[in-house]
Amino acid sequence: MKHEEETCLSIFVSLSFLLGACSDQPTETTAPKEEKANDAKETTGTKENEAKEVGTHTAQWSYDEHTGPEHWGELDPANSACVNGSEQSPINIEFSQVKTDKKLEGIHIQYQPTTFSLVNNGHTVQVNPTTESSNIVVEGNGYKLVQFHFHTQSEHQFNSQNYDMELHLVHKDANGKLTVLGVMIQERRENEKLASVWDVLPKEETEKDISVKEPVDLQALLPQDQTSFQYNGSLTTPPCTEEVKWVIFKRPIEMSKVQIQAFQEISPDNHRPVQSLKEREMIRN
């Protein structure tokens, strides 16, 4: 009898040890999996936050009160030039302050009738060439047309007066330097050269480019009298990058009231106020 009790006790102890070992094993293997899962969640969360943060920075600025021009420099450290820059654009061009005693090389504009696509980027309507056939030469350096867009009212002023709109034709050279041609727009007759662009103006922000059905002849769009003012400035939108060469034509082009209103329905006011000229020179060609 005593031998049977000892045998049962021995079996019970052995079973207990085996059950204990089995119950401990999942605990040891599960913990690392949970830690890895938590690590993965933390990593994913960080990447999602970074993506949201970057997206917010790129879409944060506007022309409205709280994220408008007065606050651009506060929205992102990359926009510091908007408040600290020494050569900011646009400017007021006082004709009496323009230097006429300096000789500048002529601007050679070599635009070809080109097909374009356009996009409403939330800040303006931007028109992009589908070829690289249009370019300019400024002071012996070649620049290719990369896009053109519009502002209302005009960003630059002549003798403290704004025009109804302003056209910016943006060009880039082989080193990434920019030259922008600025053309004032006044309300008068319909501009047939831009009719094909105005026919497809997107009223809301677009994700994909919209094709312009007919080629646009930008050479014929420019004023015949190409007297211009030149100065060194910046982008007129964040990040307000400087070292941009500006060429502002003195003579405006025309658009009808209907055409101007069609753009203003999309962008009621997308102009940056004029900035201080400081020590810069304005030169007339």
Language model features: what each stretch is:
Residues 15-16, 75:
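Residue-level signal for mature regions of secreted extracellular proteins and peptides
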Residues 4-10, 22-285:
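Alpha-carbonic anhydrase
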